[in-house]
Amino acid sequence: TLVRARTDLVVGGGCERGADAELLVRVVQEQLAAAGLHPSRIAGIASVTLKQDEPALAALCDALGGVPLRFFEADALAAIATPNPSQVVRAEIGTPSVSEAAALLGAGQGATLVLEKQKFGIGTVAVAQAPHPLRAFTAGQARGQVQLVGLGPGREDWRLAGTDAVLRGADHLVGYTYYTDQ
C-alpha cells in the first residue's frame, strides 16, 4: 500500500532539561495517534532556542524519520497569540508559550493548531497545520554544526578537497592562527 501524505504539520515541543528521550518520543507518538495525525505529515519539530542542546528533541526528530529541528528566540514566540499561555513558562524563559507558539511560528502565516498544548510529566507538545505543504522546513534557526577540517602543512594547493568551501561557509573558525590567518 502506498501512502502519500502532505508534509504540512509542525510539532512544537518543550521539555525539562535532560528529559527522557524515550518518554518524549512515546508521548508525542501517542498524542499524534490520538489526534489522528500521521507522522509522515510532519515537516519538522520546533522549540525555543534555549533547547538547542536538548538530546531528547534530537531523538524525537530521529524517531519521526529525521525531520528537521528548528528553534525560535523567546521574544519571537512571545509575539504569537496562543490559546493556552503559561505564566510559569513566561517567568522562567520570557515567553508564555513554547509548544503552541513554536508550532504556529514554524508552520507559517495562516497556520492553525490541530493539537493544542498537551502537558505531560516532562514537557508539552502541540501541532500546527500549515495552509500549504512545507516542502522544506526552514523556519527559525537550525542547530549549529561543528566541522573539523585539515588545513594540511600550510600550502593552499595541499588542502583536502572541500576544505575551502567549509571555511568560506563558516561563521567562526578555531585553530592555529598561522593557518587560520591565511
Please give the residue ranges for each predicted region.
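Short coil/turn connectors at secondary-structure junctions
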Residues: 5-9, 42, 108-111, 121-122, ...
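Glycine-rich, flexible N-terminal cofactor/catalytic loop recognition
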Residues: 34-37, 139-182
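Short beta-strand segments
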Residues: 12-14, 114-117, 128, 148-150
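C-terminal edge-of-domain segments
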Residues: 1-4, 100-135
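Conserved mixed alpha/beta catalytic, RNA-binding, or beta-rich assembly cores of soluble enzyme
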Residues: 1-51, 128-129, 175-180
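Short gly/pro/ser/thr-enriched loop/turn and capping motifs at secondary-structure boundaries
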Residues: 75-80, 121, 180-182
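Long, charge-dense
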Residues: 48-50, 57-98
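General beta-strand structural signal in soluble alpha/beta enzymes
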Residues: 69-73, 112-117, 175-176
